[in-house]
Regions:
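A short, basic N-terminal segment
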Residues: 1-43, 279-283
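Conserved AAA+ ATPase "SRH/arginine-finger" region at the nucleotide-binding site
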Residues: 82-85, 178-179, 190-204
């Protein structure tokens, strides 16, 4: 039997999979989503969200997709790229035509042909059908220079009032200096936002939220003592991925040791083991 079933939970509360249902929305996350929705609604073009590893960027992207699909299913065409490992312009453009479900007559279309097809797609849907076309790229720091140049060119397509492509780039901190390389791309960013780690109180709220989401009746079982949460925050520094992994280990230890609550000594023991393992691997 799974450990969470033993604790009376319906689902795994601390899975590292980017499930939007388990995404705790901090005040900052809510602010980012609100500003992105406004930027999309106003069709301002390019928006960027950056953050260190483990700050919840991918889950935020999935949450935005979920919100847009629910609120604007008939008016928004939402496309997402999760791992943009395309080295060449033609390769990237060909993938975009597939993503946008654009039919191409030629068996081996050139980059120019692909770009023309995408241009037609943007004007047909963005102007004639009055749709909002959104392209969200996660792990955007992986974009090659030719891909960034392609995106810069796609942002050129506009009416007198708005951009035809709403581009959201989400990535690690090194994304920002890379956006300065293609000419005029940096100046086109309408929204720049950096995700920070959670505070101590938000760490506690995140833990309780995920337990509530995993419970059978929607209540939040109290399994973590305050001292344990203090240690979790001090060790993870508020990074959601680290919080999730440590809480997962803590609940497994809770069941294996037949304890009632996760307390400070239990968490400290887990942290000590993790630290020794890292030191051993580094040696």
């Amino acid at each position: 039997m799974s450990y969470f079933k033993i604790l009376g939970l319906e689902k795994e509360p601390f899975s590292t999979s980017p499930d939007p249902a388990f995404f705790y929305l901090s005040k900052e996350h809510k602010a980012i989503l609100y500003k992105l929705k406004i930027a999309i609604r106003l069709k301002r073009g390019l928006s960027t969200v950056v953050g260190n590893v483990g700050t919840g960027k991918t889950t935020l992207a999935r949450r935005l997709f979920q919100i847009l699909r629910k609120e604007n299913e008939e008016t928004v065409l939402f496309h997402m790229i999760l791992n943009p490992v395309y080295r060449f312009e033609r390769e990237f453009l060909l993938y975009l035509t597939q993503l946008f479900q654009i039919e191409i007559d030629s068996k081996w279309p050139s980059a120019i042909e692909c770009m023309k097809k995408i241009e037609d797609y943007l004007f047909r849907n963005g102007v004639e059908k009055n749709k909002t076309i959104v392209l969200l790229i996660d792990e955007a720091q992986k974009l090659s220079v030719p891909c960034l140049e392609t995106l810069r060119m796609l942002l050129n397509y506009e009416t007198n009032e708005y951009k035809l492509l709403q581009l959201i780039l989400i990535g690690q901190m090194e994304l920002l200096p890379r956006l300065r390389k293609p000419e005029n791309l940096w100046d086109r960013i309408s929204l720049k936002y950096s995700i920070n780690p959670l505070g101590r109180d938000e760490t506690e709220e995140m833990i309780n939220f995920r337990l509530k989401q995993a419970s059978r009746n929607g209540s939040s079982p109290i399994l973590f003592e305050d001292g344990a949460i203090d240690e979790i925050y001090n060790y993870t520094q508020g990074y959601p991925r680290k919080i999730t992994m440590l809480c997962h280990d803590a609940l497994e230890a809770l069941v294996m040791e037949s304890r009632e609550f996760v307390d400070r000594p239990l968490v400290c023991n887990l942290i000590s083991k993790a630290t020794k393992l890292v030191e051993t691997e580094a040696a």
